[in-house]
Amino acid sequence: MRNASGPRGPSLATLLFLLLIPEGGCERIIGGDTVVPHSRPYMALLKLSSNTICAGALIEKNWVLTAAHCNVGKRSKFILGAHSINKEPEQQILTVKKAFPYPCYDEYTREGDLQLVRLKKKATVNRNVAILHLPKKGDDVKPGTRCRVAGWGRFGNKSAPSETLREVNITVIDRKICNDEKHYNFHPVIGLNMICAGDLRGGKDSCNGDSGSPLLCDGILRGITSFGGEKCGDRRWPGVYTFLSDKHLNWIKKIMKGSV
């Protein structure tokens, strides 16, 4: 479900402008390992249809943060306390009350790939289900920072989704590198509201089915899995994550406060 990079975008001048503008204005796990069961209790498995999954993070008892390109509907199921994609006694299955895609989400540029989902019922917090708190500030993540991302997506480009939760350690890559001709080449532009992360040698990445998974850097929630290249784990196209900037955090808090 993690998006692959799209066709040629706007002009280079426009792309450079997008990269430099300030905050204002409106995948599968490759190269990772299966986690200890229920050791990531904040993870939410999103079953959007019989054969489509995404992931998300439980940020309040009845709120999940995921990606805007995950097509959440009234019939979508949010499974908390999951290690396996199959039924487990620890799982809590909740349904959607209302979805709030980020209003400035752009399918073409991939800017603002965030979505808040309010659940019909509150989750029961226990050893298998826990809240992942939002960061206090939207501090940018420096290149070289170690991060981790988990999900139930593919662990190989031709594989089916993983039956169990997997996680991979990745490193933040400078946006200038991700935008150069050896990588995304500004198609699309990796802007200030995105985090580029993976391994410059390739082989470590999120993948299809990991969309919406939380990116944790130094143990802090910093991003949401958004898109990547045609092939997961390809060194030319590291994974790209929506950065939880102050602008995004303010929107999240406003939506949750206004929907009480």
Swiss-Prot record:
Cell compartment(s), UniProt: Secreted; Cytoplasmic granule
Propeptide: 27-28
Active site location: H69, D113, S211
GO-annotated biological processes: cytotoxic T cell pyroptotic cell death; granzyme-mediated programmed cell death signaling pathway; killing of cells of another organism; negative regulation of DNA binding; negative regulation of endodeoxyribonuclease activity; negative regulation of oxidoreductase activity; positive regulation of apoptotic process; protein maturation
Domain named Peptidase S1: residues: 29-257
CDD domains, per the entry: Tryp_SPc
Main location: secreted
Lineage: superkingdom: Eukaryota
Keyword Ribonucleoprotein belongs to the record: no
Tissue specificity of this protein: Found in cytotoxic lymphocytes and in normal lymphoid tissues such as thymus and spleen.
Keywords: Cytolysis, Disulfide bond, Glycoprotein, Hydrolase, Protease, Secreted, Serine protease, Signal, Zymogen
Chemical reaction(s) catalysed: Hydrolysis of proteins, including fibronectin, type IV collagen and nucleolin. Preferential cleavage: -Arg-|-Xaa-, -Lys-|-Xaa- >> -Phe-|-Xaa- in small molecule substrates
Carbohydrate-modified residues: N157, N169
Top EC category: hydrolase
Cleaved signal peptide residues: 1-26
Homology family: Belongs to the peptidase S1 family. Granzyme subfamily.
Role summary: Abundant protease in the cytosolic granules of cytotoxic T-cells and NK-cells which activates caspase-independent pyroptosis when delivered into the target cell through the immunological synapse. It cleaves after Lys or Arg. Cleaves APEX1 after 'Lys-31' and destroys its oxidative repair activity. Cleaves the nucleosome assembly protein SET after 'Lys-189', which disrupts its nucleosome assembly activity and allows the SET complex to translocate into the nucleus to nick and degrade the DNA.
Subunit details: Homodimer; disulfide-linked. Interacts with APEX1.
Name of this protein: Granzyme A
Gene coding for it: Gzma
